[in-house]
């Protein structure tokens, strides 16, 4: 009887090991079958800024997130949480098979409610937290405003770094007023602490005010870690510092003005970490896949 018991125990143990091995193999096969995301020739997969589909989200953010996954994206940059709590939004992101690598908040959020910003970022799993608009008088971005922004950004960066997060500023086209041998945007980049502040290059808002994005990267190596991939239609004039452009003037990537192969090559060489398609055209749902098709076909 003793030997029978030992035999049965051995059989049960072998069966359990085989079952565990089968389970691990199944999980590995599932992970391998799940696409890593859209990459093309980029070192890191292409993400999308969810602001692109804000109108789609009005009829249900869960359906919008599922659509984003179906387009091939696996990581996103958020801009709001659609009246959900951070935990609810994190669950919706997970259920859609997505992850949040970066999130946009407001200057007011960071000034008056840093604790909530940090809690929300950690709940959704974001590494980067940043702003895309600095409060100022309309049409008036001065040296005084730029220097106040520098102080704010360093303070925001310190608070977020202490919380294990990274702060960025996303340029928006009104900053490149001439200053010294450069612009006020150069001043902001030069005088913020690189240990505390990084930048997200919005290509449209770099291009529209007549700044060469490749030259900007080369002038400030290592300061840009994120990019918004966005363009304007051919034939439109550059030089505006308004920080705005009508939706109908925004272009499918590859059909606009920017030399994307040259820019992405420069960005990759400089060490950009995240790229987000942001489609603010009149038909983002229809145009985003066209932009993705172009971007994944780029070689350099």
Functional labels for PLM-detected ranges:
Residues 53-59, 75-88, 105-113, 137-140, ...:
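Acidic-and-aromatic substrate-binding clefts and catalytic sites of carbohydrate-active enzymes
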Residues 48-52, 78-80, 102-107, 131-133, ...:
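A cross-domain feature marking catalytic cores of carbohydrate-active enzymes
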Residues 2-7:
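Sec-dependent signal peptide recognition
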Residues 75, 107-198, 285:
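Active-site acidic/histidine proton-transfer and metal-coordination neighborhood
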Residues 13-16:
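C-terminal motif of bacterial Sec signal peptides marking the signal peptidase cleavage site
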Residues 18-47, 58-69, 125, 182-201, ...:
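Histidine-acidic metal/acid-base catalytic patches
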Residues 90-105, 153-156, 189-194, 260:
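Alpha-helix-loop-beta-strand connector modules within alpha/beta enzyme cores
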Residues 85-103, 149, 165, 286-296, ...:
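Short acidic, glycine/proline-enriched helix-loop-strand junctions
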């Amino acid at each position: 009887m003793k030997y029978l018991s030992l035999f049965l125990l051995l059989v049960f143990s072998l069966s359990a090991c085989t079952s565990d091995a089968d389970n691990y193999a199944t999980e590995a096969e599932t992970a391998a079958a799940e696409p890593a995301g859209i990459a093309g020739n980029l070192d890191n997969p292409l993400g999308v800024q969810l602001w692109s589909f804000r109108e789609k989200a009005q009829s249900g953010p869960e359906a919008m997130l599922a659509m984003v996954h179906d387009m091939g994206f696996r990581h996103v940059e958020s801009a709001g949480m659609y009246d959900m709590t951070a935990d609810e939004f994190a669950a919706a992101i997970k259920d859609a098979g997505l992850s949040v690598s970066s999130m946009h908040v407001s200057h007011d959020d960071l000034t008056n409610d840093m604790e909530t910003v940090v809690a929300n970022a950690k709940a959704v799993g974001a590494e980067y937290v940043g702003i895309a608009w600095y409060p100022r008088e309309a049409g008036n971005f001065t040296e005084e405003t730029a220097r106040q922004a520098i102080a704010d950004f360093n303070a925001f960066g310190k608070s977020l770094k202490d919380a294990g997060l990274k702060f960025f500023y996303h340029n928006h086209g009104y900053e490149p007023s001439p200053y010294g041998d450069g612009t006020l945007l150069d001043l902001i980049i030069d005088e913020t602490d690189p240990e505390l502040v990084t930048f997200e290059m919005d290509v449209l808002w770099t291009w529209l005010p007549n700044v060469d994005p490749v030259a900007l990267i080369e002038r400030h190596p290592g300061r840009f870690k994120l990019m918004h991939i966005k363009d304007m239609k051919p034939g439109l004039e550059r030089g505006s510092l308004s920080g705005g452009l009508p939706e109908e003037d925004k272009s499918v990537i590859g059909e606009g003005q920017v030399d994307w192969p040259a820019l992405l090559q420069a960005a990759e060489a400089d060490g950009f970490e995240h790229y987000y398609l942001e489609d603010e055209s009149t038909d983002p749902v229809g145009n985003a896949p066209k932009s993705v098709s172009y971007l994944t076909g780029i070689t350099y």
